[in-house]
Amino acid sequence: MMKNAPTPTLPRCAGEGADSALCKIPARAGRARSLSRFSGGGLGRGLFALATLLAATPAHAYLAYVSNEKGNSITIIDTETLQAIKTVKVGRRPRGVELTKDGSELFICAGDDDSIQVLDTRTLQITGKLPSGPDPELMALSPDGKTVYVSNENDNLVTMIDAQTKRQIGDVPVGVEPEGMAVSPDGNILVNTSETTNMAHLIDTRTKQIIANILVDARPRFAQFKADGSELWVSSEVGGTIAVIDPVKHVVKQKISFEIPGLSKEAIQPIGISFTKDGKRAFVALGPANRVAAIDAETKKVEKYLLVGQRVWHLAFTPDEKYLLTANGVSNDVSVIDTASLKVVKSIPVGSFPWGVVVAPQ
């Protein structure tokens, strides 16, 4: 584990001492929410100001939530201004983050607290927690938004949770060190990757039974379906490859590898994967290679390697797919990729060791 890098100082965007030059966002009429119960005292004024700021974001802007693994915090980024507007303290070692379908709640895997915290995205207060096993790491939400699936790294289980009642509705034993989670577009197949077993486990969400165990390369960390469900991609961090899996035949039909001049194979470690909605292009975070690979998802050829921050972990598109955001663990920042030009257009300082990122839906 690498030592902590110093946490950058972010502009203060609410309460006394707010830096309006850095944090001003154009107002949009009719969206400010009443938070009168917070109106008393300095804390109340700060929360009210921040909530009004978030609610006033233009219709074409989105909010990104970045988990800072060593900072024990969530940094909020406005994707219109491309600035961090707030950092909120949460549980210990936050990694996986997932938004509810309406964007009203953020679920946070606080691994060292053995819990999944629930953050109200309007008040920015922790309002409760979801049941989980020890050291929850990553989550996936069913397409209808009703079920949360969680990998618990230390007990080799996948937990299933009702997103509305916040109650556990099942669990499935999987391989050793479960991490990556994905759900098929029709909601029928859940995928978990187990880092030590080196497998992708395909689970029928109706019967809660494993229907296939697919061997992949060493240390699989992430899984993602294409939007049409025709392919499942699994990244293997130590193996240095992407396994392209036929989710119907349950076979690896192709592997994608990476070559970057001047870097050893060992330095190229695929982690996060994001597909465009049309399924034509994929982006893969390459960890300590400090690159994101843009891949033609039809030919499986790398189109371009984009230099981002240090130790890139996970990725998230803005809903309009104008930008792709990357969480860069060692450089403590988020890189912003313009998806049309395939260029990095900005680096945004966040908290200590950013790991996960998710963007609020429209």
Residue locations for each model-derived region?
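Predominantly soluble domains enriched in secretory-pathway, periplasmic, or organellar proteins
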Residues: 51-362
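Polybasic, lysine-rich low-complexity intrinsically disordered segments
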Residues: 3-4, 25
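Glycine-biased, low-complexity coil/linker segments
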Residues: 15-16, 30, 40-41
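Glycine-rich adenosyl-binding loop in Rossmann-like folds that engage adenosine-containing cofactors
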Residues: 11, 36
